[in-house]
Every structure is written in C-alpha cells, then in structure tokens.
C-alpha cells in the first residue's frame, strides 16, 4: 500500500480557517482548535441574528407607524389602522408605511383619513 501524504490539504484547511478567524481576539485567532470552535460559534450567531434582525426591523416599523398615528391626535390605535387597511384592501406593508411615516407624514394622514371613511 502506498503512503498518502496529506500535509498540503490539512495546511490549506487550516489556512482558510486562520483567514476566517484573523479578526478574533487572543487565542481565538491563534490556536487551531479554539479557532474551529469560535468559527462554529460565530456562524451559529450569524444564523440566529439573521432571524432576529427581521423581527427587530418589524418592531421598529410598527413603533414608527404607531408613533405617527398617535401624533395625529385622533384616538386611533395601530391595530385599528392595520385592520382598516386590510378591510379597504390597500396593499401597503409595514416597511413602506414606516417610510411614509418618516418621510411624508401628510401622505400617511391622507391614507388614514381615507381608510376611516
């Protein structure tokens, strides 16, 4: 049986790992086993936080819409606003509504008055 030399493959794998972990602090960027563990942990965190970012932005949009609705001075809650939007079949998602609330409040006032009728 012939001898298999795999030093290059292992070195290439560790080099890739070292490039990934180069920005980590301390032993996390120097020791191979620690780098491996930290890489797994970093990827897990990245995966988890991609979902969290979606939830956080949705919360931010809802907060912005709610703040502008309460500024109108009318006793009109966010959930009634969204409910009336669906009843009138206006297809505006929360992201677009939040942008309108931030950049063009008069437009949101108009939308709100139209769906109240």
UniProtKB/Swiss-Prot annotation:
Residue pairs linked by disulfide bridges in the UniProt entry: none
UniProt record, GO biological process: ribosomal large subunit assembly; translation
InterPro entries xrefs: Ribosomal_bL20, RIBOSOMAL_L20_CS, Ribosomal_protein_bL20_C
GO molecular function, one term: rRNA binding
Keywords associated with the record: Chloroplast, Plastid, Ribonucleoprotein, Ribosomal protein, RNA-binding, rRNA-binding
Subcellular localization, as worded in the UniProt entry: Plastid, Chloroplast
Keyword RNA-binding recorded: yes
Family designation: Belongs to the bacterial ribosomal protein bL20 family.
Protein name: Large ribosomal subunit protein bL20c
Organism: Olimarabidopsis pumila
